[in-house]
């Protein structure tokens, strides 16, 4: 076991886990008894989906997020697979579309109605047929619409293009055939240009998902990898598995060199799989153990020692699977930075656990909520398949704010209600470079900035405080006058703070629009 320093300066040093109360949990949920090492749970701001037991085939439940408490024993299921469901994933760009894979060697795409299900949903939108054996994993592309990856027990990863009217897709657009055994996990980097996998041969591979060639391969004997995860834009990988002495272990890798890990850490001697989760906004890493109730969390940095242990959430209720809420579904008013949904089979319970940063102020905490990935794709399927790469579109989590990184792309689907609204007066999309040195888009921004400055009278100076001229009035003579002036100044300070926050957000939006235009000009 590695030694952890007792103190470290970090704004996340005192993050703690807060389990939901009994009435805010999901009770009497028939959770699957499958022995596969998958999450079995998928969450978005509208629904929680969980794989369940079903006679005569595979099924999963889709429960509205607000419908907590005891579940009706006859609650409708999503069923249509002929074998057990092994994995489910929500479309990151459509909160009402979910993919499922099964032992029947098929993948199905489902449209979930916005209203509450009243009977079993058996009609799927698309069926993907191509694997020769059962399909164990599905993964949506992180920035591209309608691109889905699947991994089967035929040792193949298949790339599917769903941008078609066909209800049955009889073959993938690409098959990655570089594994010698069953694929255990898949993970994309930030822009989806690289795919990392772990295999039953305990090797980590970094694959070009379009060409299907192996770019890097780890054959380090001291670490038998089970799960792998890209760590955002840090150009690092995190894998969990076992050491030579069968201790549960995690290892950090440089994605450019997988010969030897940057660091290794033995955790304990339990046998359950370790599920890693990374929050690229806060650079926090969470390690969740299957079969125990603990959640360890670390802070990741570019400098040594790279991984800094923070603390651990402990619980007596062991989790069989785990789901996580996307950042856009968190409660920013309570300084929530991550949320887990633990599947507790011993109690037929789904328990939300919120990771909270303790803050005294109730205002929006800008430092712990940087811009995060929005529910809008930055590429179409055709663009990605033709070789384009682009990072995710960003949004602010501040209530009532706009998309910060709005690319000039046609929207693939309407935004969900939980997402922030786009400004009613966006910049005009650029179809070709301007003739006068490509300066036309910047002139639009200059006009917009000038108009905004004029509307807010930034060039004027005022000495009035709530109609009270501080330079013309004599100093207060009585205690009552002093109190009146004090309260007026307090109210003015509060109003100015709110105005300053609004202007900072608007300034950041304008800066990001300029950045986006420059990037777009560079691609033309």
UniProtKB/Swiss-Prot annotation:
PROSITE patterns linked to this entry: WD_REPEATS_1, WD_REPEATS_2, WD_REPEATS_REGION
UniProt repeat feature WD, residue ranges: 80-120, 130-170, 178-217, 220-263, 269-308
Biased composition (Polar residues): 404-424
Region Disordered, annotated ranges: 403-436
Keywords: Actin-binding, Coiled coil, Repeat, WD repeat
SUPFAM superfamilies membership: WD40 repeat-like
GO cellular component, one term: transcription repressor complex
Gene Ontology molecular function, alphabetical: actin binding
Keyword Coiled coil appears in the UniProt entry: yes
Residue runs in coiled coils: 484-523
Assembly behavior: Binds actin. Component of the N-Cor repressor complex, at least composed of NCOR1, NCOR2, HDAC3, TBL1X, TBL1R, CORO2A and GPS2.
Similarity comment: Belongs to the WD repeat coronin family.
Name of the protein described by the UniProt record: Coronin-2A
Organism: Mus musculus (Mouse)
Name of the gene this protein is made from: Coro2a
């Amino acid at each position: 076991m590695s030694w952890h320093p007792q103190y470290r300066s970090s704004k996340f040093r005192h993050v703690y886990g807060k389990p939901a109360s009994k009435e805010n949990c999901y009770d009497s949920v028939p959770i699957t008894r499958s022995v596969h090492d998958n999450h079995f749970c998928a969450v978005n701001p509208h629904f929680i989906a969980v794989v369940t037991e079903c006679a005569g085939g595979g099924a999963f439940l889709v429960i509205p997020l607000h419908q907590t408490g005891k579940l009706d024993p006859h609650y409708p299921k999503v069923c249509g697979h002929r074998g057990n469901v092994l994995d489910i994933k929500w479309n990151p760009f459509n909160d009402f579309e979910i993919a499922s894979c099964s032992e029947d060697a098929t993948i199905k795409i489902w449209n979930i109605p916005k209203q509450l299900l009243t009977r079993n949903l058996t009609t799927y939108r698309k069926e993907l047929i191509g694997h020769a054996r059962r399909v164990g994993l599905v993964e949506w592309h992180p920035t591209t619409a309608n691109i889905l990856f699947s991994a089967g027990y035929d040792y193949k990863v298949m790339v599917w293009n769903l941008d078609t009217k066909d209800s049955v897709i009889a073959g993938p657009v690409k098959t990655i055939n570089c594994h010698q055994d069953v694929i255990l996990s898949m993970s994309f980097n930030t822009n989806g240009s690289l795919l990392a996998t772990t295999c039953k041969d305990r090797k980590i591979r970094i694959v070009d998902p379009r060409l299907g060639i192996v770019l890097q391969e780890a054959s380090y004997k001291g670490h038998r990898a089970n799960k792998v995860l890209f760590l955002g834009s840090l150009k690092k990988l995190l894998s969990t598995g076992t050491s030579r002495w069968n201790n549960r272990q995690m290892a950090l890798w440089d994605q450019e060199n997988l010969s030897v890990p940057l660091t290794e850490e033995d955790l304990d001697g339990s046998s359950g799989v370790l599920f890693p989760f990374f929050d690229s906004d806060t650079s926090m890493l969470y390690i969740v153990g299957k079969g125990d109730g603990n959640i360890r969390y670390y802070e990741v940095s570019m400098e040594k020692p790279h991984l800094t242990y923070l603390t651990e959430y402990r619980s007596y209720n062991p989790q069989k699977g785990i789901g996580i809420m996307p950042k856009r579904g968190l409660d920013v008013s309570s300084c929530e930075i991550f949320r887990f949904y633990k599947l507790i089979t011993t109690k037929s319970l789904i328990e939300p656990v919120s990771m909270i940063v303790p803050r005294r102020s109730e205002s929006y905490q800008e430092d712990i909520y940087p811009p995060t990935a929005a529910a809008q794709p930055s590429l179409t399927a055709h663009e990605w398949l033709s070789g384009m790469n682009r990072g995710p579109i960003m949004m602010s989590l501040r209530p009532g704010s706009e998309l910060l990184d709005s690319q000039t792309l046609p929207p693939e689907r309407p935004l969900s209600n939980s997402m922030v609204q786009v400004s009613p007066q966006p910049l005009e999309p650029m179809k070709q470079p301007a003739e006068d040195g490509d300066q036309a888009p910047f002139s639009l921004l200059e006009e917009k900035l000038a108009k905004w400055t004029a509307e807010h009278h930034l060039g004027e100076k005022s000495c009035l405080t709530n109609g009270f001229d501080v330079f013309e009035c004599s100093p207060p003579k009585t205690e009552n006058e002093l109190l009146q002036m004090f309260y007026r100044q307090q109210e003015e300070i509060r109003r100015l703070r709110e105005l300053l926050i609004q202007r900072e957000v608007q300034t950041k939006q304008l800066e990001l629009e300029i950045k986006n235009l420059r990037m777009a000009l560079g691609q033309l």
